[in-house]
């Protein structure tokens, strides 16, 4: 997507949020600086994640790391209403190594982690096939469950996994 595509999409999203009474949001998308600029323009508060997709490729993981290291330094260019976080997309697009790095990065910079998890039955089945574990149990095994982790969706999570997340 172009910078202009993201700009107008973010502008529309902010306008809809304002119309509905939303004052603060947490977003993970391409071109996070553009979303941050729009957030400033529109007067909202936002936590904006630098999205990561490594596709289980080490070179892509390194690009993601560098991108997020630069992004987190940009926070001082914005008012206190705009904060950055890290957004490893999902367990089916991001390697375990990058998830562990994102966890360490978030702890070091005291920022949240935005992660899509347990969105579909297919994701749970694929996780069981690939890792031998459900998505939440896979994250537990990696050691990346923490209060910094914000899960988007979380539809297919059982009661034991809810307790794991709460702990």
Per-region residue spans from a language model:
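A conserved active-site cap/scaffold subdomain adjacent to cofactor or substrate pockets
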Residues: 157-160, 166-167
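Catalytic-core regions built around general acid/base machinery
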Residues: 105, 164-165
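Short acidic active-site motifs
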Residues: 34, 160-161
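Alpha-helical scaffold segments that flank or form the walls of functional sites
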Residues: 1-43, 66-78
């Amino acid at each position: 997507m172009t910078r202009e595509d993201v700009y107008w999409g973010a502008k529309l999203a902010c306008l809809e949020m304002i119309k509905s009474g939303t004052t603060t949001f947490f977003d993970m998308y391409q071109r996070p600086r553009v979303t941050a600029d729009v957030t400033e323009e529109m007067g909202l508060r936002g936590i904006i994640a630098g999205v990561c997709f490594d596709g289980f490729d080490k070179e892509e993981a390194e690009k993601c790391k560098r991108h997020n290291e630069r992004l987190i330094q940009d926070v001082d260019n914005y008012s206190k209403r705009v904060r950055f976080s890290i957004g490893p997309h999902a367990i089916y697009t991001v390697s375990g190594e990058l998830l562990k790095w994102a966890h360490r990065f978030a702890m070091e910079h005291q920022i949240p982690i935005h992660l899509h998890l347990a969105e579909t039955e297919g994701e749970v089945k694929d996780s069981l096939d690939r890792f031998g574990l459900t998505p939440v149990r896979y994250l537990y095994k990696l050691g990346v469950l923490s209060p910094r982790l914000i899960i988007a969706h979380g539809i297919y999570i059982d009661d034991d996994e809810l307790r794991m997340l709460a702990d």
